[in-house]
Design a protein with these regions (language model features):
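Coupling/switch/interface segments within P-loop NTPase motor domains and analogous charged loops
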Residues: 1-59
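A residue-level signal for conserved active-site and pocket-lining positions in enzyme catalytic cores
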Residues: 4, 66, 133, 176, ...
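Helicase P-loop NTPase motor core
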Residues: 159-162, 167-217
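Conserved helicase NTPase motor core
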Residues: 37-153, 165-172
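Conserved NTP-handling cores and scaffolds of large molecular machines
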Residues: 8-11, 55, 81, 118, ...
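Conserved N-terminal phosphate-binding loop of PLP-dependent enzymes in the Aspartate aminotransferase
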Residues: 3, 83, 159
Length: 217
């Protein structure tokens, strides 16, 4: 199952060695897939490729999609049908992506198809607004193929993008903020972020409610 999941994350059909993204793929996407490990470092496995091919036949006979097909199949469909892709680019004038640090390659490819950088790729019928939110230091879905390098290269993909840094914590205790900051600085992205604590404490629930009301007012 993990072999099939990995192949689908990289948009690989049975027998494929590189992503089949079609003529509508953003420039350099196939090269990026190779950089990220596509084809997988351990290479195709003939016996598993046969199982994968049989699995796809059974899905087709059942008129079914599995979970990974919901994204990978959409990418293949849009890449193969430029008119359909253009219609969805017109339909979605603004796109919001939460937890961007946890997207995988197939999800990234879908975002790039629907919201290409029209300044670079000379496309004017596409999403005018793309807003993503995420933190590379909170990436937790690597076991499902996510790669925080996608959020780290966002400014490369969209060089005109504005960046808003959220540097206040409203829920963590001071000790947690301090410990997390030391860990991130020592071992992760080294982004140099300093998180400020913005957290009020109240003696009772009633006083907390009053404090919230005053803040809103």
């Amino acid at each position: 199952a993990s072999y099939i999941e990995e192949r689908k994350r990289f948009l690989l059909l049975p027998g494929d060695e590189i992503p089949r993204l079609g003529p509508c793929s953003p420039a350099g996407l196939a090269e990026l897939a190779t950089e990220l490990g596509c084809p997988p470092s351990n290479g195709p496995k003939p016996e598993l490729e046969l199982a994968y091919a049989r699995y796809r036949i059974l899905l087709k006979q059942a008129h079914a999609l599995d979970f990974d097909d919901l994204v990978a199949g959409t990418v293949r469909l849009l890449a193969a049908r430029p008119a359909l892709l253009e219609s969805y680019r017109k339909r979605f004038r603004a796109i919001f992506v939460d937890e961007y640090q946890d997207v995988n390659f197939a999800q990234y490819a879908l975002i790039r198809l629907l919201a290409p950088n029209h300044e670079i790729e000379e496309l004017d019928l596409c999403a005018r607004e793309l807003f993503v939110i995420g933190d590379p230091n909170q990436a937790i879905y690597g076991f499902r193929g996510s790669d925080r390098r996608f959020i780290e290269r966002f400014i490369v993909d969209y060089p005109g993008a504005a960046i808003y840094r959220l540097l206040k914590s409203f829920r963590c205790a001071p000790g947690i903020i301090a410990a997390a900051g030391r860990l991130v600085d020592a071992d992760l992205s080294g982004s140099g972020k300093t998180i400020a604590l913005s957290r009020s404490e109240f003696a009772t629930e009633a006083s907390e409610a009053e404090g919230i009301a005053r803040e809103i007012d």
